[in-house]
């Protein structure tokens, strides 16, 4: 399993800082008293894309070398990662293709399209998602940015 180093995190911060908001960290005395612990809530829903996956997707996109940009990026996602990746790809000026189940919320689809992403719909099953995604990558040659298991994306700060 890949565990990002401190240097990986510093490099990630440099890649993404022009493209993300510095979001607040909130606390709650009430919840602290209920749990017996000091809790901190990082408000990533305040990101420019409006969703919490903006840092990882931005780091993945802005961490790609220039020779990998022509064909763009692709992923499969029902929502948050799709929005974040299409936002980051748009900022970098590269194509983004997202495989989404046809049952994904219309608001998420509209946001992906609004950021310049191209949606390829599939049936709402893992097998359909994987088969459709394989077709997209074969057709486009795009770089796969995994929705949760991307080595570059995980080093975000």
Model-identified regions with their sequence ranges:
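PLP-dependent amino-acid enzyme catalytic core
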Residues: 1-156
